[in-house]
Protein backbone atom coordinates (compact mmCIF):
# COMPACT_ATOMS: atom_id res chain seq x y z
CA UNK A 1 0.00 0.00 0.00
CA UNK A 2 2.82 2.36 0.93
CA UNK A 3 4.67 1.66 -2.33
CA UNK A 4 1.47 2.18 -4.32
CA UNK A 5 0.86 5.51 -2.58
CA UNK A 6 4.45 6.61 -3.21
CA UNK A 7 4.20 5.76 -6.91
CA UNK A 8 0.92 7.69 -7.22
CA UNK A 9 2.43 10.70 -5.44
CA UNK A 10 5.42 10.72 -7.77
CA UNK A 11 3.16 10.52 -10.82
CA UNK A 12 1.05 13.45 -9.61
CA UNK A 13 4.12 15.57 -8.88
CA UNK A 14 5.64 14.75 -12.27
CA UNK A 15 2.36 15.61 -14.01
CA UNK A 16 2.14 18.96 -12.19
CA UNK A 17 5.71 19.83 -13.11
CA UNK A 18 5.11 18.93 -16.77
CA UNK A 19 1.92 21.01 -16.88
CA UNK A 20 3.61 24.02 -15.30
CA UNK A 21 6.46 23.82 -17.81
CA UNK A 22 4.02 23.61 -20.69
CA UNK A 23 2.05 26.60 -19.40
CA UNK A 24 5.10 28.76 -18.79
CA UNK A 25 5.94 31.24 -21.56
CA UNK A 26 9.00 30.43 -23.57
CA UNK A 27 12.04 32.28 -22.32
CA UNK A 28 13.20 35.06 -24.59
CA UNK A 29 16.36 34.30 -26.43
CA UNK A 30 19.15 36.58 -25.28
CA UNK A 31 20.14 39.14 -27.86
CA UNK A 32 23.17 38.20 -29.89
CA UNK A 33 26.28 40.23 -29.13
CA UNK A 34 26.78 43.08 -31.56
CA UNK A 35 29.70 42.90 -33.97
CA UNK A 36 32.87 44.38 -32.51
CA UNK A 37 33.00 48.14 -33.18
CA UNK A 38 35.91 49.72 -34.97
CA UNK A 39 36.10 52.06 -31.98
CA UNK A 40 34.39 51.12 -28.71
CA UNK A 41 33.30 53.56 -25.97
CA UNK A 42 34.56 56.69 -27.70
CA UNK A 43 34.21 59.59 -25.24
CA UNK A 44 32.57 62.78 -26.52
CA UNK A 45 32.00 64.51 -23.16
CA UNK A 46 32.87 64.51 -19.47
CA UNK A 47 29.85 62.54 -18.19
CA UNK A 48 30.15 58.72 -18.05
CA UNK A 49 27.09 58.39 -20.31
CA UNK A 50 28.62 60.52 -23.07
CA UNK A 51 30.07 57.73 -25.17
CA UNK A 52 29.58 56.25 -28.62
CA UNK A 53 30.46 53.08 -30.52
CA UNK A 54 31.69 53.40 -34.10
CA UNK A 55 31.53 50.87 -36.94
CA UNK A 56 33.46 51.99 -40.02
CA UNK A 57 33.40 50.33 -43.45
CA UNK A 58 36.50 49.37 -45.38
CA UNK A 59 38.73 52.18 -46.53
CA UNK A 60 38.01 53.89 -49.82
CA UNK A 61 36.22 57.06 -50.81
CA UNK A 62 34.68 59.05 -47.92
CA UNK A 63 31.53 57.31 -46.75
CA UNK A 64 28.06 58.33 -45.57
CA UNK A 65 27.47 58.06 -41.83
CA UNK A 66 24.40 57.12 -39.81
CA UNK A 67 24.14 58.32 -36.22
CA UNK A 68 21.82 56.11 -34.15
CA UNK A 69 20.11 57.39 -30.98
CA UNK A 70 18.46 54.77 -28.77
CA UNK A 71 14.95 55.05 -27.35
CA UNK A 72 13.63 54.32 -23.86
CA UNK A 73 11.57 57.37 -22.94
CA UNK A 74 14.76 59.21 -21.92
CA UNK A 75 14.66 56.98 -18.83
CA UNK A 76 16.61 53.92 -19.95
CA UNK A 77 18.37 52.29 -22.90
CA UNK A 78 21.96 52.51 -24.08
CA UNK A 79 24.15 52.50 -27.18
CA UNK A 80 24.26 48.67 -27.32
CA UNK A 81 20.71 48.54 -28.70
CA UNK A 82 19.89 45.03 -30.04
CA UNK A 83 18.30 46.37 -33.23
CA UNK A 84 21.78 47.37 -34.35
CA UNK A 85 22.51 43.68 -34.86
CA UNK A 86 20.69 43.65 -38.20
CA UNK A 87 21.65 47.18 -39.21
CA UNK A 88 25.42 46.94 -38.86
CA UNK A 89 25.79 44.31 -41.64
CA UNK A 90 23.50 46.34 -43.94
CA UNK A 91 25.55 49.46 -43.36
CA UNK A 92 28.79 47.61 -44.01
CA UNK A 93 27.40 46.18 -47.24
CA UNK A 94 26.43 49.68 -48.38
CA UNK A 95 29.74 51.20 -47.19
CA UNK A 96 28.03 53.38 -44.61
CA UNK A 97 29.56 54.19 -41.22
CA UNK A 98 27.34 53.59 -38.20
CA UNK A 99 27.73 55.44 -34.90
CA UNK A 100 25.59 54.56 -31.87
CA UNK A 101 25.30 57.30 -29.26
CA UNK A 102 24.71 57.03 -25.53
CA UNK A 103 23.53 60.13 -23.71
CA UNK A 104 22.46 61.43 -20.31
CA UNK A 105 18.94 60.54 -19.23
CA UNK A 106 16.29 62.55 -17.38
CA UNK A 107 17.59 61.25 -14.05
CA UNK A 108 20.96 62.86 -14.85
CA UNK A 109 19.48 66.33 -15.38
CA UNK A 110 20.11 67.64 -11.86
CA UNK A 111 19.07 71.29 -11.77
CA UNK A 112 18.90 71.63 -15.56
CA UNK A 113 15.50 72.84 -16.81
CA UNK A 114 13.71 71.42 -18.58
CA UNK A 115 15.19 67.99 -17.82
CA UNK A 116 14.97 66.91 -21.47
CA UNK A 117 17.55 69.55 -22.33
CA UNK A 118 20.41 67.31 -21.15
CA UNK A 119 19.31 64.57 -23.55
CA UNK A 120 19.03 66.94 -26.49
CA UNK A 121 22.26 68.74 -25.67
CA UNK A 122 24.11 65.42 -25.60
CA UNK A 123 22.72 64.30 -28.95
CA UNK A 124 23.73 67.55 -30.63
CA UNK A 125 27.15 67.42 -28.91
CA UNK A 126 27.62 63.90 -30.27
CA UNK A 127 26.80 65.07 -33.79
CA UNK A 128 29.34 67.89 -33.51
CA UNK A 129 31.93 65.39 -32.30
CA UNK A 130 31.26 63.03 -35.21
CA UNK A 131 31.59 65.91 -37.66
CA UNK A 132 34.92 66.85 -36.06
CA UNK A 133 36.13 63.30 -36.77
CA UNK A 134 35.17 63.37 -40.45
CA UNK A 135 38.74 63.32 -41.77
CA UNK A 136 40.00 60.72 -39.29
CA UNK A 137 37.00 58.43 -39.83
CA UNK A 138 36.78 59.08 -43.59
CA UNK A 139 33.23 60.47 -43.49
CA UNK A 140 31.41 62.44 -46.18
CA UNK A 141 29.79 65.37 -44.35
CA UNK A 142 27.30 65.89 -47.18
CA UNK A 143 25.79 62.47 -46.40
CA UNK A 144 25.08 62.36 -42.67
CA UNK A 145 21.86 60.70 -41.53
CA UNK A 146 20.18 60.41 -38.14
CA UNK A 147 17.98 57.59 -36.89
CA UNK A 148 16.18 56.62 -33.70
CA UNK A 149 13.01 55.08 -32.32
CA UNK A 150 10.47 56.53 -29.88
CA UNK A 151 12.37 58.99 -27.64
CA UNK A 152 15.41 58.50 -29.87
CA UNK A 153 13.24 59.47 -32.84
CA UNK A 154 12.18 62.64 -31.02
CA UNK A 155 15.85 63.44 -30.36
CA UNK A 156 16.98 63.00 -33.97
CA UNK A 157 14.04 65.01 -35.31
CA UNK A 158 15.01 67.81 -32.96
CA UNK A 159 18.69 67.59 -33.91
CA UNK A 160 17.90 67.64 -37.64
CA UNK A 161 15.67 70.72 -37.40
CA UNK A 162 17.25 72.87 -34.71
CA UNK A 163 19.03 75.94 -36.04
CA UNK A 164 17.39 75.47 -39.44
CA UNK A 165 19.23 72.13 -39.82
CA UNK A 166 22.51 73.64 -38.65
CA UNK A 167 24.29 70.27 -38.93
CA UNK A 168 23.44 69.81 -42.61
CA UNK A 169 21.69 66.49 -42.02
CA UNK A 170 20.68 64.87 -45.30
CA UNK A 171 18.11 62.31 -44.13
CA UNK A 172 16.32 61.14 -40.99
CA UNK A 173 14.75 57.73 -40.36
CA UNK A 174 12.43 57.31 -37.38
CA UNK A 175 10.37 54.52 -35.87
CA UNK A 176 7.41 55.29 -33.58
CA UNK A 177 8.34 58.98 -33.29
CA UNK A 178 6.80 61.55 -30.97
CA UNK A 179 6.65 64.36 -33.52
CA UNK A 180 5.12 66.84 -31.09
CA UNK A 181 5.75 67.44 -27.41
CA UNK A 182 3.27 70.28 -27.12
CA UNK A 183 0.58 68.91 -24.75
CA UNK A 184 -2.15 71.00 -26.38
CA UNK A 185 -1.28 69.80 -29.87
CA UNK A 186 -0.81 66.23 -28.65
CA UNK A 187 -4.33 66.14 -27.17
CA UNK A 188 -5.73 67.61 -30.40
CA UNK A 189 -3.98 64.92 -32.44
CA UNK A 190 -4.29 62.03 -29.97
CA UNK A 191 -7.02 62.64 -27.34
CA UNK A 192 -5.68 60.04 -24.91
CA UNK A 193 -2.09 61.30 -25.00
CA UNK A 194 -0.30 60.80 -21.68
CA UNK A 195 3.43 61.01 -22.46
CA UNK A 196 5.86 63.86 -22.02
CA UNK A 197 5.19 65.58 -18.68
CA UNK A 198 8.42 64.33 -17.09
CA UNK A 199 10.45 65.82 -19.93
CA UNK A 200 9.50 69.22 -18.54
CA UNK A 201 9.58 68.32 -14.86
CA UNK A 202 5.85 67.81 -14.30
CA UNK A 203 4.34 64.81 -12.48
CA UNK A 204 1.52 64.11 -14.95
CA UNK A 205 0.10 65.16 -18.31
CA UNK A 206 -2.76 67.28 -16.97
CA UNK A 207 -0.46 69.34 -14.76
CA UNK A 208 1.83 69.88 -17.73
CA UNK A 209 -1.12 70.92 -19.89
CA UNK A 210 -2.40 73.30 -17.19
CA UNK A 211 1.03 74.97 -17.02
CA UNK A 212 1.71 74.88 -20.76
CA UNK A 213 2.00 78.65 -21.15
CA UNK A 214 4.74 78.74 -18.51
CA UNK A 215 6.96 76.38 -20.49
CA UNK A 216 5.90 77.38 -24.00
CA UNK A 217 9.37 78.70 -24.94
CA UNK A 218 10.83 75.29 -24.08
CA UNK A 219 8.08 73.49 -25.98
CA UNK A 220 8.79 75.63 -29.04
CA UNK A 221 12.50 74.86 -28.73
CA UNK A 222 12.21 71.07 -28.42
CA UNK A 223 8.99 70.06 -30.21
CA UNK A 224 9.72 68.66 -33.70
CA UNK A 225 6.42 69.80 -35.24
CA UNK A 226 7.03 73.40 -34.19
CA UNK A 227 10.59 73.31 -35.49
CA UNK A 228 9.38 71.82 -38.77
CA UNK A 229 6.91 74.67 -39.27
CA UNK A 230 9.74 77.19 -38.87
CA UNK A 231 12.42 75.35 -40.86
CA UNK A 232 13.36 76.70 -44.29
CA UNK A 233 12.06 73.99 -46.67
CA UNK A 234 15.18 74.02 -48.83
CA UNK A 235 17.34 73.34 -45.76
CA UNK A 236 15.23 70.54 -44.28
CA UNK A 237 16.44 66.93 -44.47
CA UNK A 238 14.44 64.19 -46.17
CA UNK A 239 12.34 62.22 -43.68
CA UNK A 240 11.52 58.52 -43.69
CA UNK A 241 9.06 57.37 -41.03
CA UNK A 242 8.15 53.85 -39.96
CA UNK A 243 5.56 52.62 -37.49
CA UNK A 244 1.92 51.63 -37.02
CA UNK A 245 -1.04 52.98 -38.96
CA UNK A 246 -3.01 55.81 -37.38
CA UNK A 247 -6.28 54.84 -35.62
CA UNK A 248 -9.48 55.16 -37.62
CA UNK A 249 -11.52 58.36 -37.08
CA UNK A 250 -13.26 58.21 -33.72
CA UNK A 251 -11.00 55.46 -32.37
CA UNK A 252 -8.54 56.03 -29.54
CA UNK A 253 -4.95 54.96 -30.01
CA UNK A 254 -4.15 51.70 -28.25
CA UNK A 255 -0.63 53.00 -27.65
CA UNK A 256 -0.96 56.79 -27.66
CA UNK A 257 2.74 57.34 -26.98
CA UNK A 258 3.65 55.61 -30.25
CA UNK A 259 0.50 56.32 -32.26
CA UNK A 260 0.78 56.43 -36.03
CA UNK A 261 -1.03 59.77 -35.84
CA UNK A 262 2.28 61.41 -34.89
CA UNK A 263 3.76 60.25 -38.18
CA UNK A 264 0.70 61.24 -40.22
CA UNK A 265 0.48 64.75 -38.77
CA UNK A 266 4.20 65.35 -39.28
CA UNK A 267 3.86 64.19 -42.88
CA UNK A 268 0.98 66.62 -43.42
CA UNK A 269 3.14 69.53 -42.27
CA UNK A 270 5.92 68.37 -44.60
CA UNK A 271 3.50 68.12 -47.53
CA UNK A 272 2.15 71.61 -46.91
CA UNK A 273 5.70 73.00 -46.87
CA UNK A 274 7.15 71.02 -49.76
CA UNK A 275 9.52 68.96 -47.59
CA UNK A 276 10.35 65.38 -48.54
CA UNK A 277 8.67 62.89 -46.20
CA UNK A 278 7.64 59.30 -46.82
CA UNK A 279 6.65 56.09 -45.10
CA UNK A 280 9.44 53.57 -45.49
CA UNK A 281 12.04 51.34 -43.92
CA UNK A 282 15.75 51.39 -43.14
CA UNK A 283 16.79 50.37 -46.66
CA UNK A 284 15.07 53.47 -48.10
CA UNK A 285 16.96 55.60 -45.59
CA UNK A 286 20.31 54.08 -46.61
CA UNK A 287 19.44 54.71 -50.26
CA UNK A 288 18.98 58.43 -49.55
CA UNK A 289 22.45 58.59 -48.03
CA UNK A 290 24.23 56.64 -50.75
CA UNK A 291 22.88 58.76 -53.61
CA UNK A 292 25.03 61.54 -55.07
CA UNK A 293 24.30 64.92 -53.49
CA UNK A 294 23.53 66.24 -56.98
CA UNK A 295 20.50 63.95 -57.04
CA UNK A 296 19.14 65.08 -53.67
CA UNK A 297 20.15 68.70 -53.60
CA UNK A 298 21.58 68.24 -50.10
CA UNK A 299 25.04 69.59 -49.41
CA UNK A 300 27.12 69.32 -46.26
CA UNK A 301 28.16 72.44 -44.37
Report each predicted region and the residues it spans.
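Primarily recognizes the serine-hydrolase "nucleophile elbow" in alpha/beta-hydrolase
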Residues: 128-190
